[in-house]
Amino acid sequence: VAVMGGEPEAMFRRAISELGGMKQFVKPGQKVVVKPNIGWDKVPELAGNTNPQLIAEIVKQCFAAGAKEVTVFDHTCDDWQKCYKNSGIEAAAKAAGAKVMPAHLESYSKPVNLPNGQKMKKAKIHEAILNCDVWINVPILKNHGGANLTISMKNHMGIVWDRGFFHQNDLQQCIADICTLQKKAVLNVVDAYRIMKTNGPRGRSASDVVLAKGLFISPDIVAVDTAAAKFFNQVREMPLDTVGHLAKGEALKIGTMNIDKLNVKRIKM
């Protein structure tokens, strides 16, 4: 589902209703993780991190569907306490009733095998992901210096302890490899309310940001990232073959890039 032209909460409410409501993905009594991008010490207007209003709405919907608890975390790049605070996500998540958990220590992560990985055969994954019943992946759509675009697949780097391995060993392949994790997100929600078009993933100034008012959601991670990447191309040219992890993900059978054959609902608000 692709929604355009609304505020983050309203777009998500519309999108999730098109997929049959959050109860399709979250069952009563479940422990849920909502995994935003909180990587950077940036305010929401600079589009470095997932929109906090969107995160709050998703958390509320999880509880409305009967979730027992909802946990929010990310393995940040900048100082984690500053990221959690200045992104607005910690306050928004807590106000909606979620627990907010850190990820800055290796002890939070446990080793997991990735038998289908090509370059990466194992990774240390955050215990919140390993211990939850279901998780929801909520990236922001951004330009990225290394991966060209960072969306849902790339957002998996925030559940992993050793990010350095990715950058030293074929980043695009490792992004696809981590998405072969057996415990896949039940839903991917791409925040394209504000898009960082240049100088990502950190960004330099407000001139890097475009108010695009988009949202994409799907259980298929490759499809949702392909749709978001095509949307990014309306703002700045970025051939999909330069975002190599999409095709590599399709090759590993974690989703499809052929979004024309899917029933994509496009909604203007």
What are these regions (language model features)?
Residues 1-269:
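N-terminal and secondary-structure boundary signal
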